[in-house]
Each structure stands twice: as C-alpha cells, then as structure tokens.
C-alpha cells in the first residue's frame, strides 16, 4: 500500500498542473460544469460498505479506506437521529482527494459520542485514474450541488432548519462557500468551521506561477486531460482561478453564518497559510 499511496500523491500533484488555468477559464460558464461522478460504493454519497474502526492518524485511516472502499466512520449517517434542542445536525465535509472515512474516522465517532447527529459523504471521484477513495477531485461546482442535495436530505430527516458544517481543506473552504453563495445554501447553514481551508486559493508552493508560464497549447491539452479524468478541483483551488474570484468576489462571508477557520503555518499544500483566513466583512463571528 505504500507504493499505491506514493503513486496517488504523485498523481494528485500532477493533477494540480493539469487542471489549473484552463479550467479556471471554463469556470466562468455554468454550462461547462462537469457532471458529478458518483462513488460506486457510496450511492448518493452515502458510504455503503459497513463501518470501520477509529484511527488517530489520517495515514492509517487512508490506508484502511483504500482496502475497504465505501467504509463509513462509526456513529455517522443515522437518519433517525434526534437533534437535541439548541443543536443542529453536523455535516463533515472531506477535502480534495479525501473521503468520509479517511478524513473523519476519528472526529465522526467523537462528535456522535457527544450527542450530535453527524453526517458525512463521499462523491465526485476521478475517472480512469486513482480510485473512488479519492473523492471531491471533480468540478467544485458539481460537488457544491451534491452538498446541497445532501444538506436537504439531512434537514428533511432531522426536521432541522439549518445545519453546521465542519470541513477540511476544500471541504472547509471553496466547496461549502460555493454552495452557500451560488446554490442557495445561505439560509440553510448556521456555522461553518474550516480546518486548513484554502478560502483565497493556494499557491501550491509556487505551482500557480509555473502553470501560468505554460504554453497555451500545453494548457489546452492538460485542460482536456483534467476534464476527462474528473480532476478539475485541483486547478480551481489555485490562487487567482476564475472560480475563486467568482465565489469570493463579494467578500468572504455572508450575514447570518458564524465562521471559524483553523490554520497552521506548517501546511505545505495550502500556501501561504494566510490564504486560510476570512475577513470580517459580513460574518457573525
């Protein structure tokens, strides 16, 4: 599995190059949204291959999820769960290349143990490369639409007017914010907590400038490759992408939602770390 993991990381890094500037241009047209690609073992996003153990490191959880595609964390996705007065359902959103178990095998059970109704999902996986354990690699806008459908399902099951989000990387940044700002989510979310969330786009340690310098013919080829393999999310998260500008052009936040962002100077993927921070232009917190 070490070889597979290294290959996966390498492929994901290459995808950053292959998905960048051309996809950012395509993002200006809603008609160009790549259709959502479902994970075979997670119909409608719901992991359907049993429940796995709790892991304390992401690498261990990732390894287990690769051997058990579609596995879920303990305690999540109980659609008969009764939300306690004053609480809201908590939706855990993985990041790019993540999945429900690899990202949330530790947090999911602990939140459920504290009495929260907890939900998570995996969707928008690659085509013809990697496997379905690498979720949310496709067009962020398609993932945002899928998030909206998941939110509505949770709200209907629990009778709750609003939900709380806890998201990692893409799942705490551009994905929930695209849903909130572009797909009617503003009235359905009470809190958004982002863990190392690239709200203003990442420089990917200089890859953004490298991509900008590629010849147009190379960009066109790589754009087609990333579309064919459903890997657009990497480029859409680079600093300056058209989708970043579209999502954040009217400010970072919207009224009525409480925002929390937790960042670290030690992150080597979402760089610089200051791109993680919200301004206080419209936030409740």
Predicted regions and their residues:
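Short alpha-helix in the alpha/beta-hydrolase fold that links the catalytic acid
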Residues: 271-277
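Conserved alpha/beta-hydrolase
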Residues: 112-129
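Serine-dependent carboxylesterase/thioesterase catalytic core
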Residues: 94, 143-247
């Amino acid at each position: 599995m070490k070889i597979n993991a290294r290959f996966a990381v390498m492929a994901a890094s290459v995808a950053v190059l292959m998905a960048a500037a051309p996809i950012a241009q395509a993002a200006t047209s809603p008609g160009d949204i790549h259709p959502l690609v479902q994970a075979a073992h997670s119909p409608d996003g719901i992991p359907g291959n049993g429940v796995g153990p709790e892991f304390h490191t992401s690498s261990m959880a990732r390894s287990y999820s690769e051997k058990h595609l579609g596995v879920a964390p303990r305690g999540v996705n109980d659609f008969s769960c009764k939300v306690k007065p004053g609480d809201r359902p908590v939706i855990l959103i993985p990041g790019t290349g993540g999945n429900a178990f690899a990202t949330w095998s530790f947090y999911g059970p602990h939140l459920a143990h504290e009495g929260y109704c907890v939900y998570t999902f995996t969707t928008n996986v690659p085509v013809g490369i990697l496997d379905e354990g690498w979720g949310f690699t496709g067009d962020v806008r398609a993932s945002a639409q899928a998030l909206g459908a998941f939110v509505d399902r949770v709200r209907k099951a629990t009778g709750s007017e609003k939900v709380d989000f806890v998201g990692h990387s893409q799942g705490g940044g551009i994905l929930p914010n695209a849903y909130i700002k572009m797909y009617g989510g503003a009235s359905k979310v009470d809190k958004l907590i982002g863990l190392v969330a690239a709200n203003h786009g990442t420089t990917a340690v200089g890859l953004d400038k490298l991509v900008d310098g590629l010849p147009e013919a190379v960009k066109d080829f790589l754009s087609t490759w990333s579309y064919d393999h459903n890997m657009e999310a990497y480029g859409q998260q680079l600093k300056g992408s058209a989708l970043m500008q579209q999502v954040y052009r009217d400010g970072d936040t919207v009224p009525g939602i409480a925002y929390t962002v937790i960042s670290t100077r030690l992150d080597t993927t979402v760089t610089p770390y200051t791109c993680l921070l919200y301004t206080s232009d419209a936030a409740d917190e």
